[in-house]
């Protein structure tokens, strides 16, 4: 029987919920220039920042288990928020293995190498080629090329997805140069195809995009380009097509054939799943596959359970996460987001667990079907807000988690005017969430998972489409039934925190114990005001 807490005492009437509102990509930067957040009309957030306890916390680098100065991202951010601790991320885990020359010791990689050598087949290395560090890292590709050379694999083809989203929009030439230089040093490898990530890394069930990438990789009759990779990219720039949207191009006769090996070196699952499903699942039916090569497929990480692939770095199990604590105390929780961020408030927030927890209700709001979100900067925020208000006012949920995708998804387009509109849309929605939470005497905690929209141009004056390393805001609006402050004291939020401190803060508001595994600490400090000298007590 789960332990009950004082939080359940409200079951006799309506529960006063704690509402965690995550503003995806809403970072903090003091400068106003090229800052879509500061330049937007945000009366609600401005008023809340002035009137309620607030602070800035770190959401990048070592504070979320990434290398120093590595920008945060949605997967890492939601995982850290949900876990209440800093977790070594896959980027670091894989990089450490490559740096210490331990790829040779991984059994499934050795098995693949032996099979390819015995059958004289080709190894295809497929993935995003940049140093963005969000979905992949070019150092991992270089490490795999060195591993292939050491193992004696002679035929190696690289299928490069160009970035321009987690990196500057026109930066792919520098990464292709690194790859080509690696080929020359090692004496193996060829650049077989190029494809913008827009086509190969969709996560919104735009299967017509994935189909184009699939055809590029599998069709033996796909036309070969007569131009070099550099010429193709330069011509694309001249036509105002940046790296993210580069049309699929085949450079050499190498394509996926029966018996070949494939290593997909993206480590983040959400934008790798759809393509790998189309390549590996016999029952796949989202589009007609004329060619279905039988391959030996390896992925660096687990993209989804039960895929017919071998995984190099299986997930490390996590327990005592925020969602689990809520569930184990017999309380109900509600998670909602639109399509683009739905996995983040569910799968990632729960530490990589697909299935809902006992008492966890999930609600998906479809994202608009547009080519890029600058065409619809409001996205589905209004529908999302309405569904969340209904959950808040139902009076049955103790914890509600909502993600607003607009600052991040529109920020990624690099279009300042559209991003300002996205920010203003979210600001209005926060006002509605605040009203509903207030009706229920609940508590609202507003934060973000990483920065983005606060920087719209880079130092070179080009659009900045990537995330940032800037801190993110936290605002706590106490409800009457969830007050920590009271007679003779008030609260403030301490400085020096990170995303790992959000879960402990929420547990304190919910009057639930913090598990030992949660090494984060509550951001709440109580200021005793009933004496001449204020006494600050940190809640840990």
Swiss-Prot record:
EC number: 5.4.2.12
The keyword Ion transport appears for this protein: no
Pathway: Carbohydrate degradation; glycolysis; pyruvate from D-glyceraldehyde 3-phosphate: step 3/5
Residues that hold Mn(2+) 1 according to the record: 408, 412, 467
Enzyme class: isomerase
InterPro entries on file: Alkaline_phosphatase_core_sf, BPG-indep_PGM_N, Metalloenzyme, PGAM_B_sf, Pgm_bpd_ind
GO BP: glucose catabolic process; glycolytic process
CDD domains: iPGM
Cell division among keywords: no
GO CC aspect terms: cytosol
Reactions listed under catalytic activity: (2R)-2-phosphoglycerate = (2R)-3-phosphoglycerate
Residue sites binding Mn(2+) 2 per the record: 24, 74, 449-450
Function field: Catalyzes the interconversion of 2-phosphoglycerate and 3-phosphoglycerate.
Assembly behavior: Monomer.
Name under which the protein is recorded: 2,3-bisphosphoglycerate-independent phosphoglycerate mutase
Organism: Prochlorococcus marinus (strain SARG / CCMP1375 / SS120)
